[in-house]
Amino acid sequence: CTIDTSEVMDYPPTALSLGESTIQSKGGEIKFPIPIGTYGNFSFIQAPPKSKKTFFVSLLASVYLSGGNNFGGKIRGHREGRCLMHFDTEQGHWHAQRVFKRVQDMSVTKEVGCYKTFALRTVGYKERLKFIEYCLEQNKGKNGMVVIDGVADLVSDVNNLEESNLCVQKIMQLSAKYDCHIITVIHSNFGTDKPTGHLGSFLEKKTETQIQLELNTTNKDWVTVSCKRSRGYAFETFSFSINEFGLPFVVGEIYDPLRYFAPRTLTKTTL
């Protein structure tokens, strides 16, 4: 736990990024990716019900597997041969498999490498986090991005103070211990931009990046993605939609409420 202040430490490597930033150094200009998330940390997505959270998770997961694809715009994955672990806590096996297959369908290659998928609906809430930790331990040294959709199913009640605190502390511990980036999902309180319960409050306080989804005010078929909080540079706001094949895609890296962007049409040749 001791930190040597004289030690030269590198910035945590990036797992997912959107865009680049340039800084001035003694050696000149340095460009670096603006992180959505870095290894050794966790982020979370918050959104109202039925705002396509799982579609957005699929979009991020597919970009991570491929490094970048036609669906993700300027979002980039920095996988470096690591595994993607995808846990669905809510859906039954059929619906969960459909989500996992969507991620593969969006990949630029047929061989996606190490992509491990789990449906935890039948597992009790007390055992879900233990199971996730077990999977990370079994895959030690290979873990990259870990998706937990959604975090509320890891506790009995999002307003249980003790359980919520322990859950977030465990997520912090796992991300650091296994040098992975954990992305999880939680609902927003009705009519507000706050994540639900004590669990949401603890996530806000401890997260590296807080990602907010909102139904787009310009186009009802779009969802706007913004960086509500970040420990580093905030990524630019953008929107995504769902194409005719049921696959999510970025419709514009920068969201301008005064301008109308017609969603680009994806054809079978695009896929």
Across the structure, where does each feature detected by a protein language model lie?
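Conserved inter-motif catalytic segment of the P-loop NTP-binding fold
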Residues: 69, 78-162, 166, 245, ...
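Phosphate-binding/switch region of NTP-binding enzymes
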Residues: 44-46, 50-55, 162-253
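Conserved, well-folded catalytic cores of nucleic-acid-processing
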Residues: 63, 67, 103-106, 154-157, ...
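Short acidic, hydrophobic short linear motifs in intrinsically disordered regions
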Residues: 265-271
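The Walker A/P-loop phosphate-binding site
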Residues: 1-103
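Conserved catalytic network of the ASCE P-loop NTPase/AAA+ motor domain
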Residues: 37, 76-80, 107-109, 137-140, ...
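Proline-centered turn/helix-capping motifs that create local helix->coil transitions or kinks
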Residues: 6-10, 108, 233-236
